[in-house]
């Protein structure tokens, strides 16, 4: 039945999206920790200055989320990047990731151009939207056709590199 297939697809998409989000956060933290010019605080100050609505959104999150203690504490003391990535939404994190990448010569079109579509499908899966039903719906924004690039990127993820079933999961 279509609804069962759709539920299974959403479950897989969400699992993959959470892994991608985690991998991006770990990768960004690794790059920042190796960058002697970055202390972890200046980046967040610059990010908040460029996107002034984000600190306001985080303050609002302090009143109705699981991360209220961290948001309240960091709002008073000042955010370091390792604190900020724990409370930013995926969309906000994408903005931070792109900002750091662009300003530190780490811009990668293959990754950065896929972040918004990845966020969109992640949100659709997380909000239990019917995904199979919309596969043929024409969208005004062009969809990326980067199958080889995605496969190459995924093949470099250590946890998936060792997996014998990676090829079948990508097929």
Where do the PLM segments sit?
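Short, contiguous, well-structured surface segments enriched in hydrophobic/aromatic residues
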Residues: 1-114, 132, 169
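Intrinsically disordered, low-complexity regions
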Residues: 51, 55, 67, 128, ...
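Single-residue recognition of alpha-helix boundary sites
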Residues: 32, 138-139
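C-terminal, helix-dominated tail/subdomain
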Residues: 1, 139-171
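Histidine-centered, metal-coordinating catalytic motifs and their short helical/loop contexts
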Residues: 112-134
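A generic structural micro-environment signature
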Residues: 91, 137-138
């Amino acid at each position: 039945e279509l609804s069962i297939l759709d539920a299974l697809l959403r479950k897989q998409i969400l699992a993959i999206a959470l892994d991608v989000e985690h991998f991006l956060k770990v990768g960004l933290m690794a790059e920042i920790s190796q960058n002697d010019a970055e202390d972890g605080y200046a980046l967040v100050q610059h990010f908040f200055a460029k996107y002034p609505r984000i600190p306001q959104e985080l303050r609002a999150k302090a009143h109705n989320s699981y991360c209220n203690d961290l948001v309240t504490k960091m709002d008073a003391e000042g955010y370091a990047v390792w604190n900020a990535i724990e409370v930013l939404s995926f969309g906000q994190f994408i903005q931070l990731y792109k900002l750091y990448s662009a300003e530190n010569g780490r811009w990668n079109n293959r990754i950065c151009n896929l972040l918004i579509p990845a966020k969109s499908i992640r949100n659709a899966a997380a909000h239990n939207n019917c995904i199979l039903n919309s596969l043929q719906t024409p969208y005004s924004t062009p969809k990326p056709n980067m199958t080889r690039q995605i496969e190459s990127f995924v093949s470099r993820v250590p946890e998936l590199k060792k997996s014998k079933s990676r090829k079948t999961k990508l097929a």
